[in-house]
Amino acid sequence: MGQVMLVTVLLPTRHRTHLVERTVRSLLDLANDPAQIEIAVAYDEDDTESHDYFTSTSWVTLVADYGAELQVHKTPAWGYQDLHNYYNLLAGRAQGKWLLVWNDDALMKSAGWDTMVKQEQDYMGMLHMITENYRPKFALFPLIPQKWVDLFGSVSLSNSNDSWIHHICLEANAIKLIDAVVFHDRADLTGNNLDQTYLNRTNQKKLYKSESMRQIRHEWAQRLIEYRTQL
């Protein structure tokens, strides 16, 4: 284990290297201290485009020029139905005190967003950044402490990772709003990035809403409540 960072950005991707470069630049350009940011990428083992990019000098140099940390993982092609597998793998290797559940089609809009996280770095719960173009009251890109993974063993058990975290923290009354703003450049919201990666998304809402999954989320919320009362 290396240096402890402030934030690890959890970033799974497939066939979208141009979006990865854009989103990473948005995060690091607007960070007050990019040297405290770790970019953690996961890509599928059959994704040759990503393999070529993430093993290139241009990618390594892009991150290094900001002084940020970097890790890249080639994974099984789990697919969107098991999106949580990517986040869980990355979280298990993250060096950040905080974990940002991020997408390659997201853009950071707020300067000093990392300072906002640092100001709340001892909070045990979810930090909520506003998504300016979609459901601002819902945490589409949640920040959770590494202690979350210590407590539960994973980020999420559902490919609806944002909903999983948000609903648990909502029940536990463990949500804190910060002033950072994100733009989600998703195909159904903006008309952009209507590619095969987007089209291959599979809806798991029925499973997410099942009684068994509801019960697990409730149990996690109760464990979070108990943990917070001991602080």
List each model region and its residues:
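Active-site nucleotide-sugar/metal-binding loop of Leloir-type enzymes
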Residues: 87-98
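Short beta-strand/loop segment that forms part of the nucleotide-sugar
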Residues: 35-48, 73-77
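Conserved donor-nucleotide/metal-binding helix-loop-beta segment in metal-dependent transferases, i.e.
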Residues: 111-126
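Short, acidic, metal-binding catalytic loop of nucleotide-sugar glycosyltransferases
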Residues: 25-36
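Short beta-strand-to-loop acidic/aromatic patch adjacent to the donor-nucleotide binding site
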Residues: 96-107
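Short beta-strand-to-loop element that shapes/binds the nucleotide-sugar donor at the catalytic cleft/hinge
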Residues: 125-141
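A conserved acidic beta->alpha catalytic loop
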Residues: 41-59, 107
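C-terminal catalytic/acceptor-binding lobe
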Residues: 163-231
